[in-house]
């Protein structure tokens, strides 16, 4: 006999950056584990220091960090933590990115532009990530940017079941805010047995976050319309889409999105909108300035925790959604 056999069992360790500790703590609670104590702070010049207070040698490590504002700081912190885990001899490192930063920069729209979503994936791989686990990427092709497995989770079951339980389904119409979201909206229609409508929009390519809404395709008159999107950033697109639906006779509009980015003028736009309710998951923390009266936040932690367990136990993440 050659070599050495060990009797040690696999060990799961969960680490968190400082961007969204509430979500990390809830994921840990769902898994029945504690977060690994971590010392992290900023030096006077803005550099980030990280040190884990427990050994990660030989462990299957899961590092959770959502890319919220200030996004560049938290992306960098995650990369530094990845490097620390790699140098600590972790057996495997899975990066949990509930909201994947730079996802909208997934292709070149014009010459001399970067593909920043690919750059983020390359940086994670170089820093030490073996696997990425994320929720509702802006576009599916981002999964191919990372040189390794990518587990793509979906918030649709959580959001759709919430809406379906509170709205008379006979009056429900699912609305895609643009042509790019039609496939997702179609899955909503299948789940809730509801018709589909589409808001056709056109962006001004020279002005960031500027949207002009043109027309509504489908019957929305007298209907409770549910606008479905992956993220709400400044709120311009979705509020303009809601206005178009009301102008075409919608009885009510509910907005759902996985990621509530809510930057800049979003707080005022949501507050002043005729939309009755905005429904998000907690992939990102809700900014303090946002009025919560019209906002419902659903927990994505159980979904992430189940996926982590499947990865750790060499199970199937896909099966979590095939059953639904």
Each model region followed by its residue ranges:
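PRPP-associated nucleotide enzymes
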Residues: 1-324
């Amino acid at each position: 006999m050659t070599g050495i056999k060990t009797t040690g069992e696999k060990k799961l360790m969960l680490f968190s950056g400082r961007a969204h500790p509430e979500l990390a703590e809830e994921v840990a609670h769902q898994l029945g584990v504690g977060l690994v104590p971590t010392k992290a702070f900023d030096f006077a010049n803005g550099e980030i220091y990280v040190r884990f207070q427990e050994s990660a040698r030989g462990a299957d490590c899961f590092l959770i960090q959502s890319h919220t504002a200030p996004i560049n700081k938290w992306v960098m912190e995650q990369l530094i933590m990845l490097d620390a885990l790699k140098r600590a001899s972790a057996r495997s490192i899975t990066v949990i990115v509930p909201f994947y930063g730079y996802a909208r920069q997934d292709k070149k729209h014009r010459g001399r532009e970067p593909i920043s979503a690919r750059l983020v994936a390359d940086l994670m791989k170089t820093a030490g990530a073996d696997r990425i686990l994320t929720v509702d990427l802006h576009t599916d092709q981002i999964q191919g940017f990372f040189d390794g497995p990518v587990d793509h989770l979906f918030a649709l079951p959580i959001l759709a079941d919430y809406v379906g339980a509170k709205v008379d389904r006979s009056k429900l119409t699912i609305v895609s805010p643009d042509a790019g979201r039609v496939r997702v909206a179609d899955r909503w229609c299948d789940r809730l047995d509801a018709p589909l409508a589409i808001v056709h929009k056109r962006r001004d390519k020279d002005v960031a976050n500027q949207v002009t809404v043109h027309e509504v395709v489908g019957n929305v008159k007298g209907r409770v319309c549910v606008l479905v999107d992956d993220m709400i950033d400044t709120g311009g697109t979705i509020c303009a889409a809601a206005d178009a639906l009301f102008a075409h006779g919608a009885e009510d509009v509910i907005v759902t999105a996985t990621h509530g980015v809510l930057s800049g003028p979003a707080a005022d736009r949501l507050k002043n909108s005729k939309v009755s309710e905005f429904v998000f998951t907690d992939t990102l923390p809700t900014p303090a300035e946002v009025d919560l009266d019209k906002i419902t936040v659903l927990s994505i932690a159980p979904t992430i925790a189940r996926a982590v367990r499947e990865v750790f136990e060499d199970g199937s993440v896909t099966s979590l959604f095939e059953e639904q």
